[in-house]
């Protein structure tokens, strides 16, 4: 893939390693900022890779590389395109936290180095460029192909791994990553945890929801003296105990004050509640009335 500017000035090495800084070397004094051109190269490579893999959207871009701790290995041929160079392909790797299953069903939580995207220009495939790029990454990361995980590898990529690195027996996973049998050989038994079998889902009874509602209602306690209709009456709250009746010894129960039900007074129509003051006033008015009546006789 060629571009309308000198790629040798952007990427001085045959294989350049880019990280979130998007810089493959030192910025030359007096030259314009190479970041816009590097961004264009990465974005166009990501689009070409997604088109070759028939993906709905690119998984490699300059913005995504800046936002993650990934490494992009970019391979060029500096003699092509009139000495300005062409991009042959790229390989993107990064560490991912994964939950994997081995051949026995044991569960492993690990964070391996993963191949996230791999692309070689269609016209330059089957010339050994892919092997050169992949071998450079393995040496740079000091890792074996079987120790890595592969994110949604295409059939062509799986054929490349089998032919070049003898990776044949993949272990089925519940996610989009592919690992091979050798991946679990370097993991200790402490890292492996047997996954408990899932409980069979039983049929939900039609009255189970009603029963749960009844239990939930029974757990609610209304404040005294509001008593639930149809239910057993709740005891009235305890009166605060006097200092003499409160127990201070460890292990003894506090004494309860005796309950004194208040007597209800029923008033007939026309009656008013009586009190000593009212009775005294009524007696005085009656005595005065009697004396006034005697004076007229």
UniProtKB/Swiss-Prot annotation:
Changing residue 151 to A: Reduces activity to 1%. GO terms for biological process: alpha-tubulin acetylation; microtubule cytoskeleton organization; neuron development; regulation of microtubule cytoskeleton organization. Changing residue 117 to A: Reduces activity to 3%. Causes the formation of a constitutive dimer in solution. Disruption phenotype: Morpholino knockdown of the protein causes developmental defects at 48 hours post-fertilization (hpf), including cilia curved body shape, short body axis, hydrocephalus, small head and small eyes. Morphants often do not respond, or have slow startle response, when probed with a needle, consistent with neuromuscular defects. InterPro entries: Acyl_CoA_acyltransferase, Atat, GNAT_ATAT. Monomer. Gene3D superfamilies: 3.40.630.30, 6.20.370.120. PROSITE patterns: GNAT_ATAT. GO terms for molecular function: L-lysine N-acetyltransferase activity, acting on acetyl phosphate as donor; tubulin N-acetyltransferase activity. Residues 266-278, 286-297 have a biased composition (Polar residues). Its EC number is 2.3.1.108. It catalyses: L-lysyl-[alpha-tubulin] + acetyl-CoA = N(6)-acetyl-L-lysyl-[alpha-tubulin] + CoA + H(+). Specifically acetylates 'Lys-40' in alpha-tubulin on the lumenal side of microtubules. Promotes microtubule destabilization and accelerates microtubule dynamics; this activity may be independent of acetylation activity. Acetylates alpha-tubulin with a slow enzymatic rate, due to a catalytic site that is not optimized for acetyl transfer. Enters the microtubule through each end and diffuses quickly throughout the lumen of microtubules. Acetyl-CoA binds at residues 118-131, 154-163. Keywords: Acyltransferase, Cell junction, Cell projection, Coated pit, Cytoplasm, Cytoskeleton, Membrane, Transferase. Residues 1-184 form the N-acetyltransferase domain. Its main location: cytoplasm. One of its GO terms (cellular component) is clathrin-coated pit. Residues 241-264 have a biased composition (Low complexity). The record marks 53 as: Crucial for catalytic activity. This is Alpha-tubulin N-acetyltransferase 1. Changing residue 154 to A: Reduces activity to 8%. It comes from Danio rerio (Zebrafish). It is found in: Cytoplasm; Membrane, Clathrin-coated pit; Cell junction, Focal adhesion; Cell projection, Axon. Residues 230-240 have a biased composition (Pro residues). Belongs to the acetyltransferase ATAT1 family.
